Amino acid sequence: MSGVAGGASKKSSSRTMATKKLIIDEFKRRLRDNIKSLNDNFFHIIQAAKVNPDDNAYKNQTGKMTEFYTTKNEMAVRAQLMVRASDELLKLTADLKEFLILHDFHFLTHNIKQAEAQCEETLRQQSHQHNCLDSEVSNILFDLEREIAENFYLRHT
């Protein structure tokens, strides 16, 4: 019985690992596609913003206006595609956080313990620095009080 349960456990574990790998591959694909969309659309917006210095290309005013509205609409569509890709990246970030929270407790526990240790170390260093400054200020204050007392005493006697 225990051999069967162990086999089922290994099978479940490998299935979980395969599922995690598929999810991670999907995250990578989404990231790659959205970044590519942002880059391509930004490149095409910059390319469309270039002004054609050749006025001879337009025989009449209608040609200029047609190109202007075409370029304007193309830039608006590309800007909207960039917004959509950015929104998808935000969703991807939320999905990654959810995935990490649900599937990687060991990683989170390790990071929390590491952050706590770092915080305690920083607190200890700051406390030591505070104590050093406190003793230094106390010594300076004592020297000043002694100097004032000696000078004040010498003047009024």
Curated annotation (Swiss-Prot):
Instruction: Note the InterPro entries from the entry.
Output: Med22
Q: Can the keyword Cell cycle be found in this entry's annotation?
A: no
The record's principal subcellular location, in a coarse class, is: nucleus
Q: Name one GO biological process term.
A: regulation of transcription by RNA polymerase II
One GO cellular component, as annotated = mediator complex
State its location(s): Nucleus
Q: Which UniProt keywords apply?
A: Activator, Nucleus, Transcription, Transcription regulation
* Presence of keyword S-adenosyl-L-methionine: no
Q: Which residues form a coiled coil?
A: none
Q: Per UniProt, what is one GO molecular function of this protein?
A: transcription coregulator activity
What family, per the record?
Belongs to the Mediator complex subunit 22 family.
Q: What does this protein do?
A: Component of the Mediator complex, a coactivator involved in the regulated transcription of nearly all RNA polymerase II-dependent genes. Mediator functions as a bridge to convey information from gene-specific regulatory proteins to the basal RNA polymerase II transcription machinery. Mediator is recruited to promoters by direct interactions with regulatory proteins and serves as a scaffold for the assembly of a functional preinitiation complex with RNA polymerase II and the general transcription factors.
Q: How does it assemble?
A: Component of the Mediator complex.
Put simply, this protein is called Mediator of RNA polymerase II transcription subunit 22
From which source organism is this entry?
Caenorhabditis elegans
What gene is this protein translated from? mdt-22
